[in-house]
């Protein structure tokens, strides 16, 4: 499964590990993905999303119904 937030669209970034001697080795910075179930009152069911804590705050602010319509408009199946 890809490491992409379903709400914010955050993806892994690439960068360097830096040792004390400033040697650079490539690495990935992964988003803090969490799997969370949300109750959708309009559909009378739970929806499981893979999202970051920022995505959870967006759902708290806008509401799960608005966020789900945005996700479905992008063509993702939820």
Swiss-Prot record:
It comes from the Bacteria. GO terms for molecular function: structural constituent of ribosome. Pfam families: Ribosomal_L28. Transmembrane segments: none annotated. One of its GO terms (biological process) is translation. InterPro entries: Ribosomal_bL28 (IPR026569), Ribosomal_bL28/bL31-like_sf (IPR034704), Ribosomal_bL28_bact-type (IPR001383), Ribosomal_bL28_sf (IPR037147). One of its GO terms (cellular component) is cytosolic large ribosomal subunit. Keywords: Ribonucleoprotein, Ribosomal protein. HAMAP family: Ribosomal_bL28. Belongs to the bacterial ribosomal protein bL28 family. This is Large ribosomal subunit protein bL28. It comes from Colwellia psychrerythraea (strain 34H / ATCC BAA-681) (Vibrio psychroerythus). The gene is rpmB.
């Amino acid at each position: 499964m890809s490491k992409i937030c379903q709400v914010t669209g955050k993806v892994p970034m690439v960068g360097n590990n830096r040792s004390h001697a400033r040697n650079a080795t490539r690495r990935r910075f992964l988003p803090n993905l969490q799997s969370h179930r949300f109750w959708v009152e309009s559909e009378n069911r739970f929806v499981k999303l893979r999202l970051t804590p920022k995505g959870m705050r967006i759902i708290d602010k806008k509401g799960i119904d608005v966020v789900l319509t945005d996700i479905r408009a992008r063509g993702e199946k939820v």
